[in-house]
Each structure stands twice: as C-alpha cells, then as structure tokens.
C-alpha cells in the first residue's frame, strides 16, 4: 500500500498538520488576573490523514508551561523539540500505537500561559475606561494562538470549539454564548462561562476577553458589549447600521451562518481597528467617534464572516485572499449599497493613499509589496500592512471591470460556496474564476489575457484604476487653496468644511500631508483653529492633523500628539505618529514611548520598537 504524503502549504507552522488534523477543541481555562495567566487544559480530537505511518503529533507552542499529556485518557510521553525563531517550541507527543486513516484520537494537554505570552494583554484597572476592574483580551492573528495553548497554528486547519471559561468577571469568546445565568462558585467568587463554535474555524480566530463588560442590543441578532460607562454611546454609534450591513452583504454573497453578529468594543490599547473573531468582532474604541463616520470598520469585520472566517487563506503568504476580498465586500456594502457607487470609489481612493504609504514604507521593490509574499522563516506580523487589503482590493476590482459587474456578482456566491469551510491559495482562486467563466467566451478571453504572474509576484504599485473622483475633487481644491498660501488671497473660514464628511476631511489632510509644498507653522496652527481639527472627537481627523502639524514644524501639535499616543493603541495611528514624532523631536518620541510602552499591546510595542530603534529591544 502506498504511503500517503500530504505536503503542508503553510511555512509558518512547525506542526505536522499534514499527518494529523484537529477536528474539535475543548478549551477549559481559568482566568487568573492576579497572576496574569490562563491555566487549564485543552482537549484536541485529531483525525489521522495517513495510514498509520505517523507515530508522533507535533504541535505549535510558544512560551507555554505544559503540565502533562494524555492520549485517549492514558498518560503519554512528550517532549519539547529545539526552539525555532520566530515560530516557537514544537511539542512532540509520542503515540504508543498506529492510527489508521480517518480514525480519531483524543489528546488532553494540561497548560498554563506565561508572562511571555504574545497573544494576551492584561490591563490594570487604570488602563480601562471606568478604572474599576482589571481586563484581559487575546489577539491571536497571525501566529499567536500557540502562546495560549498547543495547537496546529495554521489557517490551513479548521475545527469546531467549545469554551469553558472560569473568571471573576464577564467573559466573551469566539463562540455562541450559552445565555443562562453563569454558575458562580461562592468560595472563589468566580463564574463559569460557556460558548460553542459549531462552524469550524482556524486557530487565529480563537478569542477570549474578560472584564467589566455589559451588553446592549444593536439589532435583531446583534449586541454591543463594552464597559458599562461607554455602553450607551457605543450602542448609539452602531445600532443604526449593523443590521443594514448584514442584510446588504447577505444579498451579495449568501445568508449569514454564524447565528449572532456581536461587537465587543475593547479598551483603547487594542492594536487593530478590528479583529474578525467569529460571533464577537473585537473592535477599537477609536471607531466610536460620536458621528457614525468610522463604522466602516464594522462593515469590514462583518464581511470577514464570509471572506476569511468561512473561506480562508491557506497560509499568510496568500493573506490578500482574506483581506482583499473583505475590503472589496466592505466597499460593496457600506459604500455602494448604503451610500451609492461614488462613495465606493471615494473609499478606494482613501485606500490607494494607504497603499502608497505602505509601499513607501517597505520600498517599492520589497517582497512584502507583492500580492503573494514569501514568508519562509519570517514572522507574518512583519509583513502586515495595507498592501494585502488594498492591492488585493484593486486586483478584484480590476477583475470586476474586466468581466463586468453583473457577471462578477454571479461569481461571488459561487466562489464563497465552493470554498465554504475550506482554506485555499491564490492558484486555486485563479483556477476557480477561469473555470467559472470558461463558457462565457468574452469573459474567458479577458481573464486569459490577465498577466496573473505580474499581479501575483510583481512588487510595487499595481496600475491605478480610473476612479470616480467626484467626492474628492472638492477637498482636492481646498487642499490646493491651503498649499497656495501665503502667496494667494485665500482666507480660510469654518464654512470651508461645512457639509463635508469626516472621511472627506481625512482626504483633505492627506493631500496637504503628501504635498512637497510645506505649510508654515503659523498656517498649520491657523488650520487647526479655524476648522477645530485638534479638538476633533474623530481620531482619524485628529491624528492626521497632528501629522500635518509635525511636518510643518508646528510646536502647538506636540502635546496633542503625545496625548493621542497615550490614549490609543491602534497601530494604524500609533506607528505613523511615532515615525513623524521622531523626525520632529526624536527625544520626545523616545520619552513618550518609554512612558506609554506598557499601555500598548505586545504586538504594537514590538512594532514601534522596530520603527524607533531599528530592531526589537531586548
């Protein structure tokens, strides 16, 4: 009988997932706030994908304490293999007997996290909004689940999950909550919280949070969860659009499969805009801008319920399949279906600016500017940028324009049905779209003429589409007027920006920021005063105005910049602010980072250290 060989597709895991596949995990954890640890056990059900040839199960771990391993209820021998940076320490579990193809075994691992865990952030009461209780949350993407529990930490493996979590404070997890009164142990003051995830998910979507959390309805299948003192304002921000977004995307793809769609608004040190943890999107409080202008983050994370969470990139080298598709769907939903087609183009223009910024950061010939990256031996976090989002979006938009929007609309549900519950790479995507359109001679001809290799492997910017600029022309004109000063007769008035959306003001500030013409410090200060920019509740606006001011050498933005850096941990804002601050006043940049580094999430802290010091500080 021939040996079964299943080549692994993911270079960022040390597990032998080509021989064993985890099909269900039960996670039993006690949240120990005093020790800043999770302690408990995880039970994997593994299916053999060989004919008894593999007698070892190798799992990813990173800085974990293992208490013991049982296989089918019996103690089993195990060992740590040599550590390999940046992937951690493989855990090798020995099996006493062969397991035939498609047979399953149960592996129970006793585990405690350590202070070196990269997936968890522990906040003191002082770091929360109402300053009453400690708080913890996880961020497992891309390869941080392995620092919570031993697993096959790859998006190429998906399994169902049960969570049994004990905590003195309310718990959120990436499963459907069992909505009954949690059982409380009177002696310890802790309660058991249970969640079930019946849709198979990859390890990076394992999520936990616990703290002083309350919930309020934002739709017929949705709640927002956050600190009690912020609950009303978060509810107001999200209740008008959440169900509208779900309905819009269901029309484009197919019905939502996860049961509930909820949003957890985290404390301000959360490093991303949002994380698409199933059933509970984790989101930054920076979207709560009191004007409902920043909730495109919710449209984006909701779109992940189809692209990414149901249909997943097989490895982080093909990350554009998650993020390019999600950005495409987000713009079809929050922009085209809610605001109209010109708004989709307006968002794409904002995205193009983010794309060029990322290209400039890496260098236009860098490997990380390709659609398909080479991550062998690399940390996927180092490649994280807007490139997979925006270059991916532009590729899909290009394909849409080639075949026509209505035909592309027929392809969308076909694609998401074909790979529902599966992981795929770029080559399978290419084969699928070519196959779908092969009977349509016109579309097939156009797709066969696409330079696929150039799109997949060429570094740098793709061709720029011919976007509808109607919503940006007015702010381009306003930027030109400012850049004509002091040599023109333009007199800035508050009326200049009346009627503009916050996102239009963002584009205005970006135009000023990228111009080779530099504002004087006096003009920068005037802009802030006349338009009220430094005082804006909308952090997208306030952060860009601070960058404009620093570029102009305007000392008046120094304190607002430092204040912003002390109250938000979202990398989208923190990293550019530090990069600009160090050019403006390196000493203050370093002092500010030293003051606030414990406020930032470990992922954010490591990235800013690289930005400021060139490499991670020891």
Swiss-Prot record:
SMART domains: Leuk-A4-hydro_C (SM01263). Its EC number is 3.4.11.-, 3.3.2.10. Keywords: Cytoplasm, Hydrolase, Metal-binding, Metalloprotease, Nucleus, Protease, Zinc. InterPro entries: Aminopeptidase_N-like_N (IPR045357), Aminopeptidase_N-like_N_sf (IPR042097), ARM-type_fold (IPR016024), LTA4H (IPR012777), LTA4H_cat (IPR049980), M1_LTA-4_hydro/amino_C_sf (IPR038502), M1_LTA4H (IPR034015), Peptidase_M1 (IPR001930). PANTHER family: LEUKOTRIENE A-4 HYDROLASE. It is found in: Cytoplasm; Nucleus. GO terms for biological process: cytoplasm to vacuole targeting by the NVT pathway; lipid metabolic process; peptide catabolic process; protein catabolic process; proteolysis. Zn(2+) binds at residues 300, 304, 323. Pfam families: Leuk-A4-hydro_C, Peptidase_M1, Peptidase_M1_N. The lineage of its organism: Eukaryota, Fungi, Dikarya, Ascomycota, Pezizomycotina. It is an enzyme of class 3 (hydrolase). Aminopeptidase that preferentially cleaves di- and tripeptides. Also has low epoxide hydrolase activity (in vitro). Can hydrolyze the epoxide leukotriene LTA(4) but it forms preferentially 5,6-dihydroxy-7,9,11,14-eicosatetraenoic acid rather than the cytokine leukotriene B(4) as the product compared to the homologous mammalian enzyme (in vitro). A peptide binds at residues 139-141, 271-276. This is Leucine aminopeptidase 2. The keyword Metal-binding applies. One of its GO terms (molecular function) is zinc ion binding. SUPFAM superfamilies: ARM repeat (SSF48371), Leukotriene A4 hydrolase N-terminal domain (SSF63737), Metalloproteases ('zincins'), catalytic domain (SSF55486). Its cofactor is Zn(2+). One of its GO terms (cellular component) is cytosol. It catalyses: an epoxide + H2O = an ethanediol. Binds 1 zinc ion per subunit. Its main location: cytoplasm.
């Amino acid at each position: 009988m021939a040996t079964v060989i299943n080549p692994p597709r993911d270079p960022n895991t040390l597990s032998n997932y080509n021989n064993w596949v985890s099909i269900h995990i039960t996670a039993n954890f006690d949240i120990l706030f005093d020790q800043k640890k999770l302690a408990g056990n995880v039970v994997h059900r593994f299916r053999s994908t060989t004919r008894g040839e593999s007698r070892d199960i190798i799992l990813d771990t990173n800085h974990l304490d293992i208490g013991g391993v049982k296989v089918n209820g019996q103690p089993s021998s195990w060992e740590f293999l040599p550590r390999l940076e940046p992937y951690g320490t493989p855990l090798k579990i020995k099996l006493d007997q062969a397991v035939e193809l498609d047979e399953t075994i149960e592996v129970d691992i006793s585990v405690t996290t350590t202070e070196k865990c990269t997936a968890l952030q522990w906040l003191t009461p002082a770091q929360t909004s109402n300053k009453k209780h400690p708080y913890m949350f996880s961020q497992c993407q891309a390869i941080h689940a392995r620092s919570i529990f031993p697993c096959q930490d790859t998006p190429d493996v998906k399994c169902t999950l049960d969570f049994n979590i004990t905590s003195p404070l309310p718990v959120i997890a990436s499963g459907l909550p069992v909505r009954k009164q949690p059982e409380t142990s009177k002696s310890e003051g802790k309660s058991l919280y249970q969640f079930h995830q019946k849709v198979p998910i990859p390890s990076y979507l394992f999520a936990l949070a616990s703290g002083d959390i309350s919930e309020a309805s934002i739709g017929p299948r949705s709640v927002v969860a956050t600190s009690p003192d912020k609950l009303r304002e978060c509810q107001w921000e999200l209740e008008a659009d959440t169900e509208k977004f779900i309905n819009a995307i269901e029309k484009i793809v197919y019905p939502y499969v996860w049961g509930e769609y909820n949003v957890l608004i985290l404390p301000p040190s959360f490093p991303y805009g949002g994380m698409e943890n199933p059933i509970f999107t984790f989101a930054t409080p920076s979207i709560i801008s009191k004007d409902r202008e920043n909730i495109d983050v919710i449209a984006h994370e909701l779109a992940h319920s189809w692209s990414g969470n149901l249909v997943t990139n097989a490895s982080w080298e093909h990350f554009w399949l998650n993020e390019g598709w999600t950005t495409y769907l987000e713009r079809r939903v929050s922009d085209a279906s809610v605001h109209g087609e010109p708004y989709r183009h307006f968002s794409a223009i904002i995205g193009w600016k983010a794309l060029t910024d990322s290209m400039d950061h890496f260098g236009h010939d860098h490997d990380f500017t390709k659609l398909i990256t080479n991550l062998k031996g690399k940390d996927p976090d180092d490649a994280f940028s807007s490139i997979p989002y925006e270059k991916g979006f532009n590729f899909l938009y290009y394909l849409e324009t080639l075949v026509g929007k209505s035909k592309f609309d027929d392809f969308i549900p076909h694609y998401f049905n074909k790979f529902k519950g599966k992981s795929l790479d770029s080559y399978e995507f290419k084969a699928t779209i070519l196959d779908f359109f092969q009977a349509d001679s016109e579309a097939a001809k156009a797709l066969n003429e696409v330079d696929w290799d150039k799109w997949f492997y060429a570094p740098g910017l793709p061709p720029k589409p011919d976007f509808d600029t109607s919503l940006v022309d007015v702010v381009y004109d306003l930027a030109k007027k400012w850049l004509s000063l002091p040599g023109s007769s333009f007199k800035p008035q508050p009326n200049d920006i009346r009627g503009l959306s916050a996102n239009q003001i963002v584009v205005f500030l970006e135009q000023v920021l990228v111009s080779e013409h530099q504002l004087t410090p006096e003009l920068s200060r005037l802009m802030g005063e006349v338009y009220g920019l430094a005082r804006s509740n909308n952090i997208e606006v306030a952060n860009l105005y601070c960058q404009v001011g620093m570029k102009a050498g305007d000392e008046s933005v120094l304190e607002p910049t430092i204040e912003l850096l002390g109250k938000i941990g979202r990398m989208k804002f923190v990293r550019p602010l530090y990069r600009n601050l160090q050019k403006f006043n390196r000493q203050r940049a370093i002092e500010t980072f030293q003051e606030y580094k414990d406020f930032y999430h470990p992922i954010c802290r490591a990235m800013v250290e690289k930005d400021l010091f060139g490499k991670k500080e020891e």
